């Protein structure tokens, strides 16, 4: 949200995500400049109006068929997680991550994969 709305940065995070092997970005109905607010930037507290915004946004995620929602805003992550922890099981299967955490996870998974592979160095007898 803030990265885009206040700084005009929309494509750079998508480029980083697209660089991850095996990951496909599926845009929601409202994304980029048209993305709907989760309620935090609108300075709403966790009231019914903010909850309604989060539910609408999560329905957009559900419509994509994606199992993970990525956002550049850590406050959005907190707000959407709040919806999940309010006991609304409808969204329990959707993981919500900020882009940096997602990319860090990918790097760590790649490091683990590389560490578990046999070394490419051949053992040569003299």
Can you annotate each of these PLM segments?
Residues 1-126:
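Iron-sulfur cluster-binding electron-transfer modules in prokaryotic oxidoreductases
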């Amino acid at each position: 949200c803030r990265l885009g709305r206040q700084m005009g940065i929309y494509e750079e995070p998508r480029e980083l995500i697209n660089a991850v092997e095996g990951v496909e970005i599926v845009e929601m109905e409202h994304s980029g400049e048209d993305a709907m607010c989760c309620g935090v930037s609108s300075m709403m507290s966790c009231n019914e109006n903010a909850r309604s915004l989060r539910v609408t946004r999560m329905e957009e995620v559900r419509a994509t068929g994606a199992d993970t929602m990525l956002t550049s805003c850590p406050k959005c992550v907190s707000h959407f997680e709040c919806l999940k922890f309010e006991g609304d099981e409808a969204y329990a299967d959707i993981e919500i991550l900020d882009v940096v955490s997602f990319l860090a996870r990918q790097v760590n998974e790649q490091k683990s994969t590389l560490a578990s592979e046999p070394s490419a160095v051949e053992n040569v007898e003299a």
